[in-house]
Amino acid sequence: MTIDHAAFVRANTSILSPPLVPEIKLHLAHEALPIWQKTEDELGEIGLPPPFWAFAWAGGQALSRYVLDTPTTVLGKRVVELASGSGMVGIAAMMAGAKSVLSADIDLFSIAAIEVNAKQNSVSLSITSEDLLTQPVPEVDLILVGDLFYEKGVAMRCLAWLEQAQAKGIDVLIGDPGRSYLPKDRLLKVAEYSVPVSRDLEDAEIKSTAVWRLA
């Protein structure tokens, strides 16, 4: 069965602006459970991870806000957005003047969401479904990471790859509300925001969320 991922994204979301970044419009779900179930039905699988692409997570919102408020962070730079989800952070980077953005996510629904969201915001991104953590670090100036330290294995792989990037002189910025495996001892806080989020996804309606630099 061939799945039209873009059609699924459009059919199961509404065009909304994340609370912290009203400049950006994304195809987002109103509730977590219905779209989660529909994703499982569409793929004929159960036990799938949440459709991360369908929500504006706290870390991504904070990182997007920081990029938009401090455009010199990305101005004229080659940027990678790791584990892009909706593509929100990459879109923010292009809006703030990045030379280029490569948005990466292994979920094909995410790839479709990034495409439709980029068009919605009139920006052009490069997109890949390759797992960049298994690849050599690309020749870029900046890597942006939102909300990727929620699971130990992923967090360890991510940090090792980001440390390789840092060793090459690449700047690394991370948006995170204090997930369990965030390596705070390796990070320098550069900004902090109170981010409105969904109780479907989080344990509070407002998450204190920081932007960190790998130090």
Name these PLM-found stretches.
Residues 1-215:
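S-adenosylmethionine-dependent methyltransferases
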